[in-house]
Amino acid sequence: MNTLEINKDFLDSLFAKAKENPRLRQNYDLRTSAEDQSQRMLNALLPGTEVAIHRHPNSSESVICLCGRMDEVIYEEVVSYLQDGEDTIRKVSYQEIERIHLNPVEGVYACQVPKGAWHTVEVYEPSVIFEAKDGAYGEDGSEAASA
């Protein structure tokens, strides 16, 4: 059995991989196996990374900021209908309703995103977060916002 020590060198290696990644982020899977019934990961995020607005209908999400400075942004889905002749067009948009500024230096370490809440992140400086969700990967009902 190998114990994983999460230290500055480990986080620096995640940041180096994130810099090489076109998405400007890199995760590290902390699960014991792919069959685990929970999701636990570290995610190194660089400024400019774009995480699509998404939600987890079957799970809340715990987010703990180990280092850096970022916002967890919560949205509500707004549905409107437009009449175009005989056609009714359904339009979906997302309105920001809350912003949680995570910054361990300022004493704001974590947040709990409610089950089913639409959310994303805005990263101001290189940050590493620990994320945890219920359910096996791919089985938590995660879905991206429609355009």
Regions found by a protein language model. Give the residues of each.
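Short beta-strand His + acidic residue motifs that chelate non-heme Fe in jelly-roll/DSBH
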Residues: 52-54, 72-73, 111-113, 119-124, ...
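A short, compositionally biased micro-patch
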Residues: 46, 56-58, 65, 106, ...
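Conserved short histidine dyad/triad with adjacent acidic residue
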Residues: 42-58, 78, 102-104
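Short, charged/polar surface micro-motifs in flexible loops or helix N-caps
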Residues: 35-38, 46-50, 67-71, 78-79
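Glycine- and acidic-residue-biased ligand/ion/polar-headgroup-sensing regions
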Residues: 58-80, 84-85
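Short histidine-centered beta-strand/loop micro-motifs
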Residues: 30-33, 43, 51-56, 64, ...
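A short, N-terminal "cap"/entry segment at the start of jelly-roll beta-barrel domains
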Residues: 1-38, 52, 85-102
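Double-stranded beta-helix
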Residues: 6, 14, 79-80, 85-105, ...
